[in-house]
């Protein structure tokens, strides 16, 4: 079957679901997709991984493949939830002097102090860890497709008292 993914190389970052814990070798979710769609799959999932750990997976992927992957899938978040990783913030705010007005050659005519958003890279938080990972991926794989899958719904899971 000809399709967009045939002959491509796709890397998968994630936790035990991506690693394939509890399934027969060759029956991870992306193994089925690979067989059906004809792409080469490279799995980097590690049991128990949180978003902070996916950065190491991305470094390993970069070392092994360079930029020779066509797409990257990220499937994580369950362990962050289970282990009560604080959500954190996407951005920090700071004040910065900026050119509010420039002349035709770009020389600043007026400088003002303005509030700016800066990405939060605090790896003790869920959002900071995602920012760190995505910053690395976007800088190293700017022309590649990156897919983020949300954590599985766990209707009957028993998490800690800080999780709702």
Question: Residue spans of the language-model regions?
Answer:
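Serine-esterase "nucleophile elbow" of acetyl-processing enzymes
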Residues: 1-67, 72
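Alpha-helical cap/lid subdomain in secreted, periplasmic
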Residues: 59-164
């Amino acid at each position: 079957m000809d399709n967009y993914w045939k002959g491509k190389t796709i890397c998968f970052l994630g936790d035990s679901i991506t690693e394939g814990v509890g399934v027969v070798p060759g029956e991870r979710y992306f193994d089925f997709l690979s067989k059906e769609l004809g792409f080469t799959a490279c799995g980097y999932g590690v049991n128990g991984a949180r978003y902070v750990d996916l950065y190491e997976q991305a470094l390993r992927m970069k070392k092994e493949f360079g930029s020779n992957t066509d797409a990257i899938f990220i499937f994580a978040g369950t362990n962050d939830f289970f282990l009560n990783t604080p959500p954190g913030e996407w951005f920090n705010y700071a004040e910065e002097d900026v050119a509010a007005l420039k002349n035709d050659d770009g020389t600043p005519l007026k400088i003002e102090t303005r509030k700016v958003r800066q990405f939060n890279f605090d790896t003790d938080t869920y959002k900071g860890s995602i920012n760190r990972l995505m910053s690395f991926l976007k800088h190293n794989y700017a022309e590649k497709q990156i897919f983020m899958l949300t954590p599985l719904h766990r209707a009957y899971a028993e998490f800690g008292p800080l999780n709702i």
